[in-house]
Curated annotation (Swiss-Prot):
Location of region: Disordered: 238-258
Modified residues (Phosphoserine): 206, 275, 296, 417
Subcellular location: Cytoplasm, Cytoskeleton, Microtubule organizing center, Centrosome
Name assigned to this protein: Coiled-coil domain-containing protein 81
Species: Homo sapiens
Residue ranges that the Swiss-Prot or TrEMBL entry lists as coiled coil: 436-493
Record's keyword annotation contains Phosphoprotein: yes
Annotated gene: CCDC81
């Protein structure tokens, strides 16, 4: 969006920025102060704020180790610039991963407009057009410092984005002070904390400070030209622009004068000596304004000497431009001498230049020491490498000269040992014989041990074979006995043999004793059938009982479900009726309130200007500084000690 607007600025010029030309620097600062207050209030509630086309204020959580495997969890505020702006201008910022449970709310222009005497369109236009100026300044590779009142300073230097928070703001966020201390002691966040002394410092001329925007270029220059930081002619154009804006204030469209009057009553103007002097000089010189900002540059010394105020000996009018000052305060304001900081600023610029030169010399010296150290290390490494190569070459040559090396020798004819070594030889021979005896004994013991182990293994194997043989015989005998018992049972239960054959017999041969067997068989079958019938009846009875129990359970479940459904329907109907009744009551209450408000608005519109207390107070003018009447010429509210009361002889 910003690049599209930046291109459109070249074609449309002043038409793209309709709001900023009608606002002064103080009004822009007031609007951005309200924006900063809204952001600070949301951050206090642990909510993030998203500024459209600029960035997001939110929190990140980090674990800081404190030793002994202990850590503390801190939640520190961060500013994340929008990715579109970063990509367009090629900026660099630290990658920050924010937790998803922190809510992010957009910038509410309505709430900001309610905090000041500006409507929503003016606030939104001021914010957006200020961000356009910021984008243009970044595109021209200028150093920018964007101040958020009560929060911190956003610094953009050398295409690097850094948000530095005030120490008081961090203490407000944390409460215990551990957050500011932890950020100041960590290497990555040591430059994220801005002390109160650094916050009151003056910006160098190469840094463009926001949100105090110089609108001097919009009248006579193209919108995309560079911002000139010198004072000179640009200061005069700024004065002309302020005069034009003062003239346009009379023709500005105001939707609700009484609402604006109420807002002004809620936010009274803070009048200082400098602002009073500016308005007095405006009425005297016909529109030329003197501000302390125009006196803060070294190149403005000549203009400062020419533009010093001329004080008048007496008071001409007490109500110039709505000042409402008494004679004493007006004379004091006219005799105030402005402070000129040109020499101090020139000294500060010179100190900064010397500090930069000293820092550059230190950096060059450190770089030279590093280079010398690297060169010495390189030379030492070269010497070590050459020495190692020489040693390796010498070892290789030595090996090539003596390729074979014998460690033992064979003598054909060994000379006899001298007589002095005879005792040693005997001792050696005795020790050798002893060693041989010990070795033979060990061999004999080992052989005997092996023979013993072999015999034990043979005995164990013989016992195992005997046990297996006994078990086999036992199993065989048991199997034989089993077969024998089976044959005996078969012989015992063997059916009767066929009757002997008798030729030409008149009596029946088969079926003589079958009647008893048939009767017994029938009885047995009857008993079987009776038992089966009883079992079937019992099974059928159990099935019927289970079915009845299931039906009863289902019926109870259906009844309970029906009762619950009816209860839910009743509760839902009651809730709907209650909601409808509440909505109806709210509607009636809202209608009554709207009717009452309309009546009050109509009565307010019909009322005259002299009916209200604040309007009546306008008849009694008071000095804005000492709160005395405007006709005051030096009287005191204190009762004098030597006051003589008329009609009394007492001297108080």
């Amino acid at each position: 969006m910003l690049d599209t607007i930046a291109r459109a600025l070249q074609d449309l010029g002043r038409q793209v920025l309709p709001t900023l030309p009608s606002l002064s620097q103080e009004e822009v600062s007031i609007i951005w102060g309200n924006v900063s207050e809204f952001v600070r209030r949301q951050l206090t509630l642990h909510k993030g704020v998203q500024i459209p086309a600029f960035g997001t204020f939110t929190f990140i959580r980090q674990k800081l180790e404190v030793g002994n495997n202990k850590f503390i969890l801190i939640q520190r505020p961060v500013f994340i610039m929008v990715e579109k702006l970063v990509q367009i201008h090629g900026l660099k910022q630290n990658k920050v991963y924010t937790p998803g449970e922190i809510p992010i709310v957009p910038l509410n222009f309505v709430m900001i407009s309610l905090e000041g005497p500006f409507n929503r369109d003016v606030v939104e236009g001021c914010v957006k057009e200020t961000l356009l100026f910021l984008s243009r300044s970044i595109s021209m590779k200028q150093n920018v410092e964007f101040t958020f009142k009560g929060i911190g300073v956003l610094m953009i230097r050398d295409s690097k984005v850094k948000m530095r928070f005030y120490k008081d703001f961090l203490c407000t966020m944390d409460g215990s002070g551990a957050l500011a201390k932890a950020l100041a002691n960590r290497p990555g966040t040591v430059d994220s904390v801005l002390s109160s002394r650094e916050a009151l410092r003056k910006w160098p001329s190469s840094v463009l400070a926001f949100p105090r925007i110089e609108l001097k270029e919009m009248e006579n220059k193209l919108p995309m030209e560079t911002l000139v930081e010198e004072c000179g002619e640009n200061r005069e154009r700024k004065c002309k622009l302020k005069d034009q804006s003062d003239k346009e204030e009379g023709t500005r469209d105001i939707s609700s004068p009484k609402r604006l009057r109420d807002r002004q009553a809620l936010f009274p103007a803070k009048v200082t000596n400098v602002s009073l002097l500016e308005k007095f000089e405006r009425s005297e010189s016909g529109g030329k304004i003197m501000t302390p900002e125009s006196l803060s540059y070294p190149s403005c010394l000549k203009h400062d000497s020419e533009m010093k105020p001329q004080t008048s000996p007496a008071c001409q009018d007490h109500n110039k431009a709505g000042q409402e000052m008494c004679y004493v305060c007006l004379q004091r304001a006219q005799r105030n001498s402005l402070l000129y900081y040109s020499e101090e600023r020139r000294r500060e610029i010179e100190d900064e230049r010397l500090i930069q030169q000293y820092q550059m010399l230190k950096d060059q010296e450190a770089l030279f020491r590093h280079q010398m150290k690297s060169l010495a290390t390189r030379e030492q490494n070269q010497k070590n490498a050459a020495y190692n190569l020489g040693v390796a070459e010498a070892i290789r040559n030595h090996k090539n000269e003596k390729p074979e090396f014998y460690k033992s020798f064979l003598f054909d004819k060994r000379p006899l040992s001298p007589a002095l070594n005879a005792l040693k030889q005997e001792e050696y021979s005795r020790s050798l014989l002893k060693q041989m005896d010990n070795r033979q004994e060990n061999e004999i013991k080992q052989r005997q041990y092996r023979e013993l182990m072999d015999r034990l293994e043979q005995v164990q194997l013989t016992e195992e074979l005997a046990a297996q043989r006994a078990k086999f015989l036992k199993d065989k005998m048991e199997e034989t006995q089993c077969y024998k018992r089976a044959l005996d049972a078969q012989i015992k239960n063997k059916p009767s043999r066929l009757p002997p054959f008798e030729p030409d017999s008149s009596e029946p041969i088969f079926g003589k004793n079958e009647g008893e067997l048939m009767v017994e068989k029938q009885k047995r079958e009857q008993n079987y059938m009776k038992h089966q019938l009883e079992a079937a009846a019992n099974h059928k009875r159990k099935a019927i009982l289970h079915q009845l129990v299931d039906q009863r359970r289902d019926l109870q479940m259906l009844q309970r479900t029906q009762r619950e459904h009816l209860a839910d329907r009743t509760a839902e109907l009651e809730r709907v009726n209650r909601v409808n009744q509440c909505l109806q009551e709210d509607w009636e209450r809202s209608a009554a309130m709207k009717k009452q408000r309309d009546l009050e608005d109509k009565a307010f519109e019909r009322a005259s200007d002299k009916l209200f207390l604040l309007d009546q107070c306008e008849k009694y003018r008071r000095c804005k500084q000492c709160q005395r009447r405007t006709s005051n010429v030096g009287e005191s509210n204190l009762w004098p000690l030597n006051k003589f009361l008329p009609g009394s002889r007492l001297l108080v």
